[in-house]
């Protein structure tokens, strides 16, 4: 099932028993964030949360944790809620090959029902804002998609970027936005500022799950998130034209903010509790001026809790990181079998590969670190043989414990790039990277003294199926 907006997705979650509606009166702080945080502490199958009775707000509706479990992630892809994680990633990979599917332009978006312009804008009146962690420096929009275009090639649809970036609400029509240098919006901004120009942007809030997944997926610079969203949902993605910027925005969004990142203007933004499980301190970041707001009558505000993993961001980013890394590596190294980059935005990746010759696995690990996503995120790579499933952690631990000799199997690369939010980087944005080679050596590599490996007998698979069927029959 393809969802055209957040509301249809919430209804589907509700139909599957994966939306918990909380009708009792709650405080905006700390209850909303604490409840979303708690979903990561109650075991598998955590539901999405819906709040519509929030003390201090008038007629506010807040949704959280919408993709915050593997069940919800499966539903977002139109799969059965019980689809295994590996099945979800395999399906993501299969649909990726449908790219590109051109979007469908639609008229009369619901977000056009109400508009506010210029000095009449007051985001505090329109959005039910609240802090996500006690140490946050302010209110944040952290699940919105930001649309920007290449100032030197504005008509190139593929170079129009849709990405998710944290934004601090700093005034009635003023935001602070963090453009991570490795992300496309940072390149757009750099090109605009070189010309002494502001960078127009459109910010979309309350989106369907597929464009949210795409906003978190590291595509190539000229790959369209809307065309990839069509591939992922297996039907053309619905877009509409934003009235001020003329940008392409999701037809089904709840709220559209349009304005500019002001050229060469920086102010302190932060701190903010980040996906690393640590606060990022205050830093000089860009300033956004909002010039037009369009919003649906009685809009739904969606927010994303971040903190000590696992939280919703890990379910959102996990497959969205594994799949592009796999596709980009597979295109250059057909020997690559699978990529597990589900941990902390892919700061750690586990990659299984066949080996053409000695040293091959290390070359694959190095390439993973220099993909579009790897430049800023892939800090450590564990390379394993093709018969080791990167998603089966006991198998990975076996490979690490039985195949790694620290004397020769650790490749340390000094002074490499990483996003500044990595608390281990020093200075912020620079780190040593590490490849751990847990593969069996092939000629001319002569590490270790490996004998014939123990493998399953031919009858094991049949017996596994038989025992599984017998257990199922007892229930």
Predicted regions and their residues:
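Extended, highly charged
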Residues: 1-272, 277-287, 291-475
């Amino acid at each position: 099932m393809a969802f055209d907006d957040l509301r249809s997705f919430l209804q589907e979650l509700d139909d599957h028993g994966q939306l918990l509606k909380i009708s009792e009166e709650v405080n905006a702080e700390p209850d909303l964030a604490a409840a979303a945080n708690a979903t990561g502490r109650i075991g598998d199958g955590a539901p999405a949360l819906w709040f519509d009775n929030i003390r201090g707000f008038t007629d506010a509706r807040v949704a959280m944790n919408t993709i915050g479990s593997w069940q919800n992630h499966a539903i977002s892809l139109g799969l059965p809620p019980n689809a295994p994680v590996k099945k979800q990633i395999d399906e993501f990979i299969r649909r990726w090959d449908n790219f590109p599917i051109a979007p469908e332009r639609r008229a009369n978006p619901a977000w056009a029902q109400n508009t506010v312009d210029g000095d009449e804008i007051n985001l505090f009146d329109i959005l039910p804002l609240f802090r996500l962690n006690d140490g946050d420096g302010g209110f944040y929009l952290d699940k919105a998609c930001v649309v920007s275009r290449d100032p030197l090639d504005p008509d190139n649809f593929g170079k129009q970027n849709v990405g998710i970036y944290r934004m601090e609400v700093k005034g009635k029509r003023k935001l602070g936005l963090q453009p991570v240098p490795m992300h496309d919006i940072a390149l757009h901004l750099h090109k605009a500022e070189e010309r002494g120009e502001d960078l127009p942007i459109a910010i979309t809030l309350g989106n369907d799950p597929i464009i949210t997944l795409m906003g978190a997926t590291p595509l190539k610079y000229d790959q369209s998130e809307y065309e990839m969203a069509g591939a992922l949902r297996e039907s053309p993605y619905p877009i509409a034209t934003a009235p001020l910027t003329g940008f392409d925005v999701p037809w089904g969004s709840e709220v559209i903010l349009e304005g500019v990142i002001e050229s060469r203007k920086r102010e302190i933004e932060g701190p903010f509790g980040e996906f690393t499980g640590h606060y990022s301190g205050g830093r000089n970041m860009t300033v956004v001026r909002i010039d037009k707001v369009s919003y649906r009558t009685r809009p739904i505000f969606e927010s994303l809790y971040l903190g000590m993993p696992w939280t919703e961001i890990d379910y959102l980013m996990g497959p969205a990181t594994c799949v592009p890394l796999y596709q980009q590596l597979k295109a250059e190294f057909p020997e690559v079998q699978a990529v597990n980059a589900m941990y902390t935005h892919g700061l750690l990746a586990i990659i299984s590969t066949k080996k053409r010759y000695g040293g091959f696995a290390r070359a694959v690990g190095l390439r993973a670190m220099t993909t579009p996503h790897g430049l800023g995120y892939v800090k450590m790579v564990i390379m394993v043989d093709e018969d080791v499933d990167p998603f089966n952690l006991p198998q990975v631990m076996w490979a690490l414990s039985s195949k790694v000799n620290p004397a020769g199997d650790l490749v340390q690369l000094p002074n490499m790039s990483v996003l500044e939010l990595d608390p281990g980087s020093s200075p912020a944005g620079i780190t040593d990277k590490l490849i751990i080679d847990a593969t069996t050596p092939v000629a001319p590599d002569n590490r270790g003294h490996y004998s014939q490996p123990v493998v399953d007998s031919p009858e094991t698979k049949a017996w596994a199926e038989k025992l599984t069927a017998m257990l199922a029959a007892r229930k």
